Amino acid sequence: MDTNTPAPGKRIHTVVQPTARSQLRSVVGYTPESYTVHYIRDDVKAQYSDEKIQSAIEELRLGTLEQDHIDSVFGAVHGNQQCRIDVFERAIELNFVLSDGTGVEVAFDREWGTDQLEVIKQIQATLEEW
C-alpha cells in the first residue's frame, strides 16, 4: 500500500461513521498508481491478506473503465451514473468513480441497507421461481 500518494476518500470515514456506526466495513480510496485504506474494521481486515486487498483494488480500478460506456448508453435517459452498488451476502459496497482508475469504495454490513434491500430480496425471490 502506498501511503505517500494521497488517494481520494480521506474525509468519507468521518462523514459516514456517525450514521453507519459499527456497520461500516471499509473506506478505500484508489488511483491508477496507488490506494489508501482510510478505514477497515478489524474483523474485516482479519479476512484479507495484502494480496487480497490488492486484488480487490485492481477489480475496482477495472470497474471504472466502463463508466464512459455506461454513461453513453444510459446517460441521455437517466443521467450519468453516480455510484455503483454491489450487494453481497454479508456486505453492500458503494463504488464512486471519479475518473478512469480512480474512485472511492465504501462498504457496509448488509443490514445497513435493510430497507433498501427489501426490494432486491423480492426481485431475487421472484427470479428463483422462474
Predicted regions: what they are:
Residues 1-130:
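Non-catalytic interaction/Regulatory regions outside core domains
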